[in-house]
Amino acid sequence: VYKRQGQNVVAADRITVEREARERQDQQVTILIHKPMGYVSGQAEDGHEPAVVLVTPQNHWNQDTSRTRFNFAQLKGLAPCGRLDIDSVGLLVMTQDGRVARQIIGEDSEMDKEYLVRVTYGDRDIDVQSVFPAEQLARLCHGLSLDGEALKPAKVDWQNPEQLRFVLT
């Protein structure tokens, strides 16, 4: 029986989760959507709608074999796992389950996140790869920072002559 937070246990102790807690956990949803351009990942901002408005019964995958069916209560507490800019398109994972979020974006996450980025260099937007300096590509792999903090190294290579593929862990 749970007595207090942080209670110590020994190997011989038996730990179970009460049925009510399991059922509550089972009711949490994770939703995958393809975010189109023009929507923000999280809260509405600057007059732009959040991607969560795209989650409707009409957009439910028709081959879903789970017994879970859409209801508007599922939108409460739904948070994006990561961020796609308003001009970005791609897979957006939204969840009510903190365990899922930590697996995807937690500090210790080892899950790769892949981005394709259309590149211009100077006034060149066709066959950019042929004029893009190799040292700048190397810098993209090891010299990125955000808000003054160095980021983990990224894998960066050419997807095609106009697009770079970034893989972030």
Language model: regions and residue ranges:
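Basic, flexible Lys/Arg- and Gly-enriched helix-loop patches that mediate nucleic-acid binding at interfaces
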Residues: K3-T169
